[in-house]
């Protein structure tokens, strides 16, 4: 059992809290930038204030779990901001271990970088690399030899075939499918339900079956 503090107290933080409880970790408290959440609780764990509550904690004994998700407009910018928060915490000496829900399936031949989060029901196959601060969400599937760039998020139910290359800060939406061997550039957004059969350039926004640019 390890001690954790969760940064954020919204919906994604609740999922991370469930993950840590399932792993029988000890969650000390949550922080949040929104004062309206201070003094509230999630599953009996207190939201005690903003990130300044970390002051005085020993970063060699307390781990950090990033409970900040991404939603709404300008998703790549939100993902970049999320990754910057994680990098700032690391620069201050805190550890953000990779987290795997006990109900996820992750091959021993896969590599998870610090801060990666794999949720319940997700599958990560052999040879895959999951970058720093990536979220592989509920029931998402990442097949063999994929490479997922730092900060990317793979939404619930999305499926990636083998050898897919995903850049940094990419959003792959709910239930999207990406066929084998495709490359997706940094900051691209794949809409929910899209079927990607061709390479996607950096910064593109695509939707549909097959996926087409919607700029």
Q: Where would I find each of the regions flagged by the language model?
A:
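Hydrophobic, well-ordered beta-alpha structural blocks that scaffold small-molecule cofactor pockets
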Residues: 1-58
């Amino acid at each position: 059992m390890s001690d954790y503090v969760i940064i954020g107290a919204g919906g994604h933080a609740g999922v991370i809290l469930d993950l840590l409880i399932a792993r029988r970790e000890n969650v000390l408290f949550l922080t949040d930038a929104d004062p309206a959440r201070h003094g509230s609780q999630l599953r009996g764990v207190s939201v005690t204030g903003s990130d300044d509550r970390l002051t005085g904690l020993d970063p060699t004994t307390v781990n950090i779990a990033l409970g900040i998700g991404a939603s709404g407009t300008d998703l790549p910018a939100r993902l970049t901001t999320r990754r910057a928060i994680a990098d700032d915490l690391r620069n201050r000496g805190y550890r953000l271990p990779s987290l795997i829900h006990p109900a996820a399936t992750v091959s021993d031949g896969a590599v998870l970088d610090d801060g990666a989060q794999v949720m319940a029901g997700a599958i990560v196959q052999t040879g895959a690399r999951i970058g720093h601060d990536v979220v592989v969400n509920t029931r998402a599937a990442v097949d063999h030899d994929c490479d997922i760039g730092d900060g990317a998020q793979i939404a619930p139910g999305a499926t990636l075939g083998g050898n897919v290359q995903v850049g940094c800060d990419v959003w792959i939406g709910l239930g999207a499918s990406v066929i084998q061997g495709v490359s997706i550039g940094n900051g691209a957004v794949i809409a929910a339900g899209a079927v990607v059969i061709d390479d996607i350039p950096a910064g593109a926004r695509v939707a549909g079956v097959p996926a087409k640019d919607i700029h």
